[in-house]
Amino acid sequence: MKKKEEGFIIHPIPVLMDNIIWIWVKEKQAIVVDPAISEPVINLLKGNGLSLHSVLQTHHHEDHIGGTQELINVWPSASVIAAKSDLDRIQFQTKSVVDNEELDILGQKIKVIEVPGHTSNHICFFLQGSKESKIDPVLFCGDTLFGAGCGRLFEGTPEQMFNSLSRINNLPKNTKIYCAHEYTEANLRWAKSIFPEDIYIEERLKEVILRKSKGFLSIPSKLSEERKTNLFIRASNQREFAQLRLHKDNWKS
């Protein structure tokens, strides 16, 4: 277990080709974010004497909900928290939430943020930090914001995704970004192909390559870092964002 915060731990489980399941642990209870598959989650929880408190679902894609049913079969008292607007596609949810709803999970305040774009009903979960407890804010953002990138627009429009990223960009700059895929290196290589002289992109790319060579993930990042190196966050208007998204969709590394 690693990635310790004050009073809790956030642990990554890399699965499939590039998915990351995040396990948030406090006092022997676990919150699982977007479990693509169940087996490694069950093994980690049982191997560490943990019980499943709840599952947070950002959206309905199979590589985010594929392991949930088996997890609640093993821990039937666990809650599944998902967007009320996605009830027809995440039918096993037991707690349906809406935009700006505030939750209290294991003593931590969580705010639900609607971020349509990748899918029409995508949500993020924002853990509000505090100076008193020395906890940085945390955002579990699924496939909306990636390291140096953003999700493809399978259901939403460029306008929706631009507005969703703008909402995220209004969060505190020290917010830690816990996305659901390890795409950072490829995203930075794409960004460098557009801005080959950008020192921030170049430095982050070198750092990511070094981290990966040592067996570490490139995420979480901080929002302050995304503001410097993520072209989608840097986009000044919807038109610029749409052009970048189209360019990225057609880019071959």
UniProtKB/Swiss-Prot annotation:
Cofactor note: Binds 2 Zn(2+) ions per subunit.
Entry's EC annotation: 3.1.2.6
Keywords assigned: Hydrolase, Metal-binding, Zinc
SUPFAM superfamilies, sorted: Metallo-hydrolase/oxidoreductase
Residues binding Zn(2+) 2: D63, H64, D143, H181
Pathway: Secondary metabolite metabolism; methylglyoxal degradation; (R)-lactate from methylglyoxal: step 2/2
Reaction equations catalysed: an S-(2-hydroxyacyl)glutathione + H2O = a 2-hydroxy carboxylate + glutathione + H(+)
GO molecular function terms attached to this record: hydroxyacylglutathione hydrolase activity; metal ion binding
Cofactors, names only: Zn(2+)
Gene Ontology BP term (one): methylglyoxal catabolic process to D-lactate via S-lactoyl-glutathione
One Pfam entry name: Lactamase_B
Binding site for Zn(2+) 1: H59, H61, H118, D143
Assembly and binders: Monomer.
Function as written in the Swiss-Prot or TrEMBL entry: Thiolesterase that catalyzes the hydrolysis of S-D-lactoyl-glutathione to form glutathione and D-lactic acid.
Family: Belongs to the metallo-beta-lactamase superfamily. Glyoxalase II family.
Protein's name according to its UniProt entry: Hydroxyacylglutathione hydrolase
Name of the gene this protein is made from: gloB
